[in-house]
Amino acid sequence: MPEYLSPGVYVEEISTGPRPIAGVATSIAGMVGVTARGPESGKPRLVTSMLDFHRLFGGFLTPPDKAGTDAADDRGIRWWLLPLAVKGFFDNGGQKLFIKRVVPAQADAQAAAWALKPAAEQKPAPGATDFELLVEATQPGAGGNDLRFDVRAVEAGRFPLVVADPPDSAPAAPPPDPAKVVVTQKGGLKTGVWVVLIRATGVGDPTFHLLADDGSPAAQGGFEFTLAPAAPAPVVAKGDTLVQVDFEAAVREVSAGAPPVTETFRAANLKALAKEVVDRSNFVTVTTGAPARLKAAVPAALPPAKLFKPFIGLTLTKGSAGESGLTAADYVGLDGGSGRRTGIQALEDIDEVAMCAVPGVWNGTVLDGLITHCTTLGDRFAVLDGPPNADLEGIRDFRAALSTDRAALYYPWLRVPDPGGATAPAAAPPSGHLIGVYARTDVERGVHKAPANTVLRGVIPGTGLAADITRREQDLLNPHGINALRAFPNLGQRVWGARTLSDDTRWQYVNVRRLFLFIEESIDEGLQWVVFEPNAEQLWASVRQSITAFLTTVWHSGALAGTTPEEAFHVACDRTTMTEDDLAQGRLICEVAVAPVFPAEFVIVRIQQATRESLTA
């Protein structure tokens, strides 16, 4: 209670009505898999478009050869398909997706690299310094092989030269040092920068030189510098010009199916340029070698045709994430605590995730880990992929090993345009596209609407399904909770199933299971204020009012059955739901019953023959 100690007017705010419960988002997804590059540690990263995914995780992955594909199929892990699934998610209306990158636990992953060396272009041995520039991708993985690193000299200023003649009164002096040059306007010119000597006559090859200061006083009529290296020393004549050059680097990522991304950097010398790249680049890191080697590496005899063109142009190679060593354990991951989890376990760090998938993986251990993850957290739903080449009998056998109301299985796989531009289509797992369908349905209709009878986007028109499922064939799938993807004349290729993998008929529909997850999570988050409040009738009434108001809104949206709220749900929180022992143990128990709407899976129209007399009687 406030204290009133002095006369005056006191304005106070008082609460009226129940605290509102806001519905949680149901369209946010999480995926786990291999990417070309990207952060390996930390929490899953949010991407909101395919362009965002390319920026953070790189482009599409190149499938292995037939032997590599067969080996991957034996493990039930087609590791290269996550980017295709991400594209399918956004093509079908998904908006927010958290990605957790998977890398092998074995230390065979390496970053793409390139080194400028006197005699070869190769990565030096660990700890070696026999290089001038070492360029490495910031993260291991094949994505580094899509990086191009160019360095070129760019003009930063021109300085006319004069030749300082010795005074007439001076005794016989030694001939002037041909490496000494004098500029009439110093401007921004200083020691330590690189310059190019341009002949007034146009004769001779322009070469790079480093300006050095040997401590000599300024020459008459200008500022004196020494050109180094000078072997042979250049002979300076009147009318010659020094062109100061800066070094400009461009890092370009060009991967199949992804828009190019370019970073640019500029500095006065290679060492400063390397620091700029290290400080600002998202793609590469640059290390300079020993100073003596670095000076010698600058092209002192650069051909004139390349003077202001890239003189270091390289494509990084030999990058690999060690995908051939991937195991089911890498996908399941380890629980090292918040921010240190890996694989599927890392999705626990993102509370907003409402649905998740491991695209292109049908390994039993991985799927068990995904189902366990969803069941343990109790607030998310999984979409699973079956084997890519399974027939009807094969997919039924595969499904027989699964039983859960927290996941759904779709068949067959999809055919999508090859991201590399090949004529032949690429095989894509359905999970990414289906999670996008879930997200779009949630936004347009609500989580209570079954994500079915919806056109699949991002697949090849007319032939986008790996198998053509007929009604008779679906009769063999639907009772087992295998959702068919079917093509219909004039209707396109559609999702034609909405069942979970549960053997309990109460939870056999995807929308019913996800509706309850939505209600449970919303109430959970909306009642956090109740904890440690006095556990008495006033609190119970507030809880009842909050839940009732929330469920009334859900009923108005069409998610609950019944013509009145009383028919749609019931909320009890009073002495009938709690005993004295419950109160003594600090328990507040509220019981809620809701009547969900079920999808019209079987539309039955009964037609009979009748006579005119019988219809008018």
Where are the regions that the model predicts?
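Short, cationic low-complexity segments
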Residues: 157-162, 271-277, 612-617
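Small/polar beta-strand repeat architecture
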Residues: 201-293
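Glycine-centered loop/turn motifs
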Residues: 42-45, 169, 176-179, 192-193, ...
